[in-house]
Amino acid sequence: MALRFPRFSQGLAQDPTTRRIWFGIATAHDFESHDDITEERLYQNIFASHFGQLAIIFLWTSGNLFHVAWQGNFETWVQDPLHVRPIAHAIWDPHFGQPAVEAFTRGGALGPVNIAYSGVYQWWYTIGLRTNEDLYTGALFLLFLSALSLIGGWLHLQPKWKPRVSWFKNAESRLNHHLSGLFGVSSLAWTGHLVHVAIPASRGENVRWNNFLNVLPHPQGLGPLFTGQWNLYAQNPDSSSHLFGTSQGSGTAILTLLGGFHPQTQSLWLTDMAHHHLAIAILFLIAGHMYRTNFGIGHSIKDLLEAHIPPGGRLGRGHKGLYDTINNSIHFQLGLALASLGVITSLVAQHMYSLPAYAFIAQDFTTQAALYTHHQYIAGFIMTGAFAHGAIFFIRDYNPEQNEDNVLARMLDHKEAIISHLSWASLFLGFHTLGLYVHNDVMLAFGTPEKQILIEPIFAQWIQSAHGKTSYGFDVLLSSTSGPAFNAGRSIWLPGWLNAINENSNSLFLTIGPGDFLVHHAIALGLHTTTLILVKGALDARGSKLMPDKKDFGYSFPCDGPGRGGTCDISAWDAFYLAVFWMLNTIGWVTFYWHWKHITLWQGNVSQFNESSTYLMGWLRDYLWLNSSQLINGYNPFGMNSLSVWAWMFLFGHLVWATGFMFLISWRGYWQELIETLAWAHERTPLANLIRWKDKPVALSIVQARLVGLAHFSVGYIFTYAAFLIASTSGKFG
């Protein structure tokens, strides 16, 4: 008999209904649940899939380089980064005739093109690329790496090259190699690239394969390194009148601590960044030699954890048993990795705009907005995933005997206290913040704006002042010119930093007031509620008072019949599902706040944000409605303009989002009945009844329909906001 899909589950393959297809897709990547899976094969499958993932990433980045080199205007943009719009790629078939062709022919192109809002032009320019040939070379190299990754994935599935389980569980060796190799060596290599290629390029010197052995990155070569006079590398930095990409006003320093931004490019000094990466490299190279492997020196992680028993006795046996628990649970490890990566991704969003690393990116407002929003949404999905896998760990991998009275067990023991405290914090934040907003709304509606409750964020202003912002008049730490902190740093990084933090044209430590105070607490409400749902889902994943045997039902189940008084919607999967809505909601508020504050900053009318952000009607009218007007005008009775594609995407995003509700609100019996009726009609309709199917059509399960609804809701939500964000920003600033 021919094998039916899914091959990995023969039980499912014999299912006579369409459930076979959907459940097959849903469990395709759940290797643990597959037939004939062994621990060894599980680890090897995951290892091989990592190579596939790398191949896709390299192929994608190669495609970016290739299309810009082929259809972009990189060489023209390099001549005038502030006034030429960077082109991502051509549009082969612009719909709606001649007006569309004219609307999308821009950036100096001969035909219709898409403008790049990803920041790649600024990035490539900063790291020293200058010509299309450079881009093609990079594309080819990445294509080669992609092929290499695919070969690597295939190779490690061959019997001779398959790693053993013991290799995957050798935590110390893996940590050493990842710290030293992945972070240490790559940071050192990047420092090398910045010093040998990027910094010379910023000073008008082109270093390529044909001359990189002859061009000294520093006039004194390696002399200062070997004689210990490292300070020579910091002497004679680029001047404040330096024109980026030319020798005019340039210096010779390669590793500096200037602080602040390059006046022309509004980005961090390249020599500061080279210094930063060198420091990171040294730290990680040392860190990668700390753990005990073949040589009997260094720390054993197990010994470290076993010794972590807080003396007060309040955490019981502390970290005893954790080493084996974590080392034997892929879900625990994935949860930790996702939690870390989620935080890092959000930090990337925050730092890319406040401390721009790429030349001229700070003046490309649409790109700034797009990159901030992009990284915050990705961070949200990654963080919710961390809790999902944490919950799966508790269901599949947690062993109570191994973890008796340690920190994990004690988390489970006092989960009621954790959940109720989070619940209390969420309720407090929600009612107080909404109360303030609604009060202010009513005052505005009744024509008495002076009766609003406006709270100055004095603690946050004090913290900003401590970092050197002088406009609040606090005179503390770095904003106090007579203090020791101020005097200690005056000769090195401080002048540049203080100039930057008190310069009103950048996004460093923006001035804050009552509107910021309110939206800050709205975002805090979103964060705490999302966390509450996720934490409760993970801590109750094994069982709750209502359903002590929950772990026996697995990660996702709809209900356990009518018998116990309501066991629907309490699986760990349901918690994840609910949390994603809150996560999207929260990031909506975060991005609205960021975008509105920056639009007013860039337009020079910050008072609009300050005055309108203290009540809900202000947000709805002066941010959402006001900024969607250009977008909605992408098509109108008089024709179309270059925003029409975003107008279409805005409508399409709403459609996808609304489709989600069809799956989220409708119930299963209704769909089953509808499907039976449609199937009956199909089988009795001439011509149509020539097409038959083997599987009996059945409605999606409750959990599946929720997943499909959630996917549509999320995708539609993000598409809608992306179109709004890009159109409203590019419509104003080009």
Swiss-Prot record:
Cysteine-cysteine disulfides: none
Protein residues bound to phylloquinone: 671
Binding site residues for chlorophyll a B3: 662, 670
UniProt catalytic activity: reduced [plastocyanin] + hnu + oxidized [2Fe-2S]-[ferredoxin] = oxidized [plastocyanin] + reduced [2Fe-2S]-[ferredoxin]
Gene3D superfamilies: Photosystem I PsaA/PsaB (1.20.1130.10)
Transmembrane spans: 46-69, 135-158, 175-199, 273-291, 330-353, 369-395, 417-439, 517-535, 575-596, 643-665, 707-727
Keyword Disulfide bond attached: no
UniProt-annotated location(s): Plastid, Chloroplast thylakoid membrane
Membrane topology category: Multi-pass membrane protein
SUPFAM superfamilies according to UniProt: Photosystem I subunits PsaA/PsaB
UniProt enzyme class: oxidoreductase
Top-rank lineage group of the source organism: Eukaryota
InterPro entries, sorted: PSI_PsaA/B (IPR001280), PSI_PsaA/B_CS (IPR020586), PSI_PsaA/B_sf (IPR036408), PSI_PsaB (IPR006244)
Binding-site residues for chlorophyll a B1, renumbered to this chain: 654
MF terms in GO: 4 iron, 4 sulfur cluster binding; chlorophyll binding; electron transfer activity; magnesium ion binding; oxidoreductase activity
Subunit description: The PsaA/B heterodimer binds the P700 chlorophyll special pair and subsequent electron acceptors. PSI consists of a core antenna complex that captures photons, and an electron transfer chain that converts photonic excitation into a charge separation. The eukaryotic PSI reaction center is composed of at least 11 subunits.
NCBIfam families, alphabetized: psaB
Protein name, entry field: Photosystem I P700 chlorophyll a apoprotein A2
Organism: Lepidium virginicum (Virginia pepperweed)
Gene name of the record: psaB
